[in-house]
Regions:
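Single conserved hydrophobic/aromatic residue that forms the stacking wall/gate
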Residues: 1-12
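Residue "hotspots" at secondary-structure boundaries inside conserved domains
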Residues: 1, 235-236, 286
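Helix-rich terminal scaffold detector
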Residues: 11-202, 258-344
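Functionally critical, mid-to-C-terminal surface segments that flank or help form catalytic/ligand
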Residues: 201, 205-256, 269
Length: 344
């Protein structure tokens, strides 16, 4: 049910139409300040653009059956931070409420799945319980969460994902190489432009996916929002540490796995560790948790190999920025001030 739940929850992010990207050579060096605010950027765009980003939020959540043991809750039809806060907030309330018959919650970008036992609680009774909890949720704008920022060295346009793509083309079906396909689809200048855009923002970890530790993320800077469909059919293998995207979500593959995301980079940094060889895994075998942030930092093959050796001898130290207080209100304020005419 974990795989089914993850796929059902993430579907809303894979069919989002994207406006034409208008980005140029701009590198956003600063991200979040220590007090949780975002750096000021010159702007001639204010409230109207911010409201556009946060459209698509339903006045009331939609409750839909997912077979006889699952309930799907949809909070909207777009991928944005506010909807993820709603999903995470309700998930936390359900855990503390100890509702009889509820086994697990699977929050994602704009929706969540509740796994329950229909012998203990009926479908409509569960909906009534959840509606009651929703009334107790405070306004998202007042929510502040602890958020860790990880810097992940990444080789973009790398030889490993290129090999996987070429193997797929040779054995499965013809397709344009993934970086070129994403570049063309998003009307970017060239693959180097694509790399600048993708690496120009922090990514919000909205949920963990179909494999232990795999993060489903969304870009915090809307100017870096790209889109790409998943493979059809999927690949039979993907290199460990691959960075890829499907819909507008970016993910990191924790291991050598089948996969359907468009792929374009690779990181040597482990994101799950069953043996807990590194201190960051002392509380969990999975590195990330919802609310974390990832910054992909372009690196070359020499740096990749150096980090890989440190990982092998267990001397690698994660590039982790200590937790900050992340505020939706301050994030919205930052959105209202950025210049959407500037390009990466």
């Amino acid at each position: 049910y974990r795989l089914v739940g993850s796929e059902m929850c993430i579907r809303d992010s894979h069919n989002i139409s994207q406006p034409k990207l208008n980005v140029n050579k701009l590198s956003v060096k600063k991200h979040i300040n220590e007090d949780g605010s975002y750096p000021n950027l010159d702007s001639n765009v204010t409230k109207e653009k911010t409201l556009e980003i946060f459209q698509g939020i339903y006045p009331e959540p939609k409750f839909l059956p997912g077979g006889d043991k699952y309930l799907l809750i949809e909070f909207g039809n777009v991928m944005n931070l506010e909807l993820n806060f709603k999903a995470q907030g309700l998930s936390n309330l359900i855990k503390t409420a100890n509702i009889k018959g509820v086994y697990e919650t699977l929050p994602c970008f704009a929706s969540m799945i509740v796994h329950y036992n229909p012998d203990d609680i009926g479908y409509q009774d569960l909906i009534n319980e959840l509606k009651s909890l929703l009334k107790d949720m405070k306004d998202n704008d007042d929510t502040v969460v602890n958020s860790r920022l990880f810097h992940f060295p990444t080789v973009y346009l790398d030889k490993w994902t290129k090999e996987a793509i070429e193997d797929y083309i040779a054995k499965i079906t013809m397709k344009k190489p993934d970086p070129e396909f994403i570049t063309e689809l998003n009307q970017l200048d060239d693959v180097n432009h694509f790399v600048r855009v993708h690496s120009g923002t922090e990514y919000w970890v909205a949920s963990l996916g179909f494999w232990p530790g795999l993060p489903f993320t969304m870009p915090l800077d809307p100017r870096c929002k790209l889109t790409a469909p998943k493979y059809n059919p999927p690949r039979t293998w993907t290199p460990k540490g691959t960075v890829g995207m499907g819909g507008s979500s970016t993910a990191i593959y924790p291991d050598r796995l089948p996969g359907g995301y468009q792929i374009f980079g690779r990181t040597p940094v482990p994101i799950w560790d069953p043996d807990k060889n590194f201190d960051v895994f002392k509380d969990s075998i999975c590195l990330f948790k919802p609310g974390d942030r990832i910054k992909f930092v372009p690196c070359d093959y020499d740096e990749f190999e150096m980090i890989e050796k440190k990982v092998e001898d267990k001397s690698y130290r994660y590039d982790l920025i200590e937790e900050h207080k992340f505020s939706i209100k301050k994030y919205k304020n930052w959105l209202s001030k950025i210049d959407y005419n500037k390009k990466f």
